[in-house]
From Swiss-Prot:
Glycans are attached at N80, N208. The gene is VTG3. The keyword Ribonucleoprotein does not apply. Precursor of the egg-yolk proteins that are sources of nutrients during early development of oviparous organisms. Produced by the liver, secreted into the blood and then sequestered by receptor mediated endocytosis into growing oocytes, where it is generally cleaved, giving rise to the respective yolk components. One of its GO terms (molecular function) is nutrient reservoir activity. Pfam families: Vit_b-sht_shell, Vitellogenin_N. This is Vitellogenin-3. Residues 1-15 form the signal peptide.
Length: 347
């Protein structure tokens, strides 16, 4: 610290006399600016600790003012030259990579950079390398630009593809997507409908139309029931099965359920009706099920329950046929209202 203060005082005195007095300090390196002040005084480290790219130590003992300024100028010139040289190497490589994909009309290097490099002692081989890099970039840059322009114009889509190296992968996807879009646009559109098996045979179609109402599984008119069949088989048929489930409690009315089954079998048709009702006089809850087989390819059924079988209703129809060239089964369901518990179970 004392040596630093002593050097500062001597520098100020030397600046006034236009001559610098010798500064002696063990293990220290001093650098004076043009005013005679101490710019750096770092013990044992010299100018390298101040950010200057020098490997030698600089010790100033007794120099004149003109020599002092000349030395400082040379020091900063050497330091700036080192940093500029490294930056120029980085920029040269970066420019070489960029020039590979730029237009060939761009100038490879400016005149100022070439003069600076020659003044800084550039070797003759570096110039030859730059020329080779430029020729390489000129060749492949032209090829890439021509190929990208041909691919963008030949795709036939409204999407344009750039010719930069960063977007080269995206350009490939662009061309692939355009080709795929064109291929998909040329594909035909097919519409397949379910064809019931009973409608494919004209004789069977006429037979079915004579015994049932016009109901087609491929239409959206809904599920219909045969008009020729009676609504209640008990009007013309005796029950096939009757069962009663009864529970009796003390001092209470008997409770239970009654089940009645009716069937009607004909040549190619079968109809079944099931009725379940409560035996309690005050309870009017009933369940009514009606299922019929129209032919060997179609069956339908309805299920009603609630008060006098009028609260809830579900209708279904099952038909076999073909979908395109494959055998298939079509199932239709219709309901007006169902309990919330049934909806939760279905979900």
């Amino acid at each position: 610290m004392r040596g630093f203060i002593l050097a500062l005082v001597l520098a100020l005195v030397g600046a006034q006399k236009h001559d610098l007095e010798p500064v002696f300090s063990t293990g220290k390196t001093y650098l004076y600016d043009y005013k005679g002040l101490i710019l750096h005084g770092l013990p044992g480290k010299g100018l390298a600790a101040a950010g200057l790219k020098l490997t030698c130590r600089l010790e100033i003992s007794r120099v004149s003012r003109s020599d002092h300024l000349l030395q400082i100028e040379n020091v900063f010139k050497v330091a700036n030259k080192t940093r500029h040289h490294k930056k120029w190497i980085h920029s040269r490589v970066k420019a070489a990579v960029t020039d590979l994909w730029e237009e060939p009309s761009a100038t490879p290097l400016s005149s100022s950079s070439s003069t600076d490099s020659s003044a800084e002692g550039e070797e003759p081989g570096n110039k030859r390398d730059k020329d080779e890099i430029w020729q390489f970039g000129k060749k492949y840059g032209a090829d890439s630009s021509s190929s990208s322009s041909s691919s963008s114009t030949g795709s036939g889509s409204s999407k344009t593809c750039s010719s930069s190296r960063e977007d080269s992968s995206r350009d490939k996807h662009c061309s692939v997507d355009s080709e795929y879009f064109n291929q998909q646009a040329d594909l035909p559109i097919y519409q397949f409908w379910f064809k019931p098996a009973d409608e494919q045979d004209p004789r069977r179609k006429v037979q079915n139309s004579s015994i049932s109402s016009s109901s087609s599984s491929s239409s959206d008119e809904g599920i219909s029931t045969p008009v020729s069949q009676p609504m209640f088989l008990g009007d013309s048929k005796p029950p096939v099965l009757a069962a009663v489930l009864r529970a009796i409690r003390r001092n209470e009315q008997p409770t239970g359920y009654q089940l009645v089954l009716y069937t009607d079998r004909q040549a190619s048709r079968l109809r079944v009706q099931v009725f379940v009702s409560s035996i309690t006089e005050s309870d009017r809850w009933k369940l009514c099920a009606d299922a019929s087989v129209v032919n060997s390819h179609k069956a339908s059924g309805t299920l009603k329950w609630g008060k006098d079988c009028q609260d809830y209703q579900v209708a279904t129809q099952i038909a076999t046929g073909q979908f395109a060239a494959h055998p298939a089964i079509q199932v239709k369901l219709e309901w007006s209202e169902v309990p919330s518990s049934v909806r939760k179970t279905a979900r």
